Amino acid sequence: CLFGLIEPGDEVVAIEPTYDCYLPILRRAGAIPKLVRVAPPDWKLPLDELAAAFSHKTKLIMINSPMNPASKVFHEEELAFIAGLLEKYDAYAICDEVYEHMVYDGRRHIPLMTLPGMAERCLRIGSAGKTFSMTGWKVGYTTGPAALIGAAAKAHQFLTFTTPPN
């Protein structure tokens, strides 16, 4: 998804700790990572730091919820704050939700794309392998608006041998 949506020099906000391949992919694509860290014991999103990470150069934010490796699940107030920043800066979100069905302790997964105005700004990543506890499958998918899916598919078709062009 990233190679289809960002250009060298674009800023991308990433929330740490993050999945280990995100930062190398961002750097390979020429993006400038803007990192915001959540920390134990409460894993609370520092909203002031998040707001400071956004600028007119921000192209997108990468959200991993439920978060790997921290298992943080973003709550509705945090997602609403992120949505406001996306609208303010005309930015997008790549939402890694591969662990969406692995939420415990009374917490609830809320996809960012379900918030008002976010369906056109979000690409959502899912995983059949994670959903069906077959992690070796490595079968993933994206959902989102046609414009974002099209851009991601054009880049992705040259990275694998099994992806149709459209």
Residue spans for each PLM region:
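Conserved core segment of the aminotransferase class I/II
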Residues: 115, 119-166
